[in-house]
């Protein structure tokens, strides 16, 4: 289950979008005492929220797959949204958060963990003849090109 914990921690630190936007359905006051009127657009800083030391501890900005979160906090933070705005594919992608008594043989790891596991089992490694390249058309750090070599399966 360590690989799944690595996937969750990576998703927390590197959400697919750094922000989320929601429109207020009623007047409210934020924790910062800022008033928000009905219909106003509110921007949620996912990068900041996912690094909140009150929730993720003093090393919140660091990669730590052994991180423990309080009940009610997900190990991947707000990266998949929350409530009615939660990503419909969250469980398919990230799987079910393991519990102490989870059976590794029938645990639902999620497709990201299963794909990463298959790549590791096949010896996936960077292709030294074709170095990876970042996508320069976006401000976010995304790979545009990352060729790998796989070992030939033994029959």
Regions flagged by a language model, labelled:
Residues 90-143:
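Cytochrome P450 heme-binding "Cys pocket" and the immediately downstream C-terminal segment
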Residues 10, 39, 63, 83, ...:
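Hydrophobic, well-ordered secondary-structure elements that form the walls
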Residues 22, 53-57, 74-76, 89-93:
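Short conserved micro-motifs at the rims of enzyme active sites and ligand-binding pockets
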Residues 1-34:
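Conserved cytochrome P450 K-helix E-x-x-R motif and the immediately C-terminal K′/meander segment
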Residues 13, 17, 66-69, 87, ...:
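Hydrophobic alpha-helical segments
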Residues 138-155:
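C-terminal helix/juxtamembrane-tail motif
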Residues 48-50, 85, 93:
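Short, glycine-/Ser/Thr-/acidic-enriched flexible segments
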């Amino acid at each position: 289950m360590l690989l799944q914990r690595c996937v969750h921690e990576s998703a927390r630190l590197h959400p697919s979008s750094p922000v989320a936007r929601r429109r207020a359905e009623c007047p409210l006051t934020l924790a910062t005492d800022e008033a928000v009127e009905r219909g106003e657009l509110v921007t949620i800083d996912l990068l900041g929220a996912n690094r909140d030391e009150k929730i993720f501890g003093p090393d919140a900005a660091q990669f730590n797959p052994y991180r423990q979160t309080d009940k009610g906090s997900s190990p991947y933070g707000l990266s998949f949204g929350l409530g009615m705005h939660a990503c419909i594919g969250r469980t398919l992608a990230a799987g079910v958060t393991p519990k102490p008594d989870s059976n590794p043989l029938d645990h639902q790891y999620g497709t990201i963990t299963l794909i990463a596991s298959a790549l590791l089992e096949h010896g996936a490694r960077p292709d030294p003849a074709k170095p990876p390249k970042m996508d320069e058309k976006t401000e976010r750090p995304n790979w545009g090109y990352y060729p790998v070599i796989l070992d030939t399966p033994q029959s």
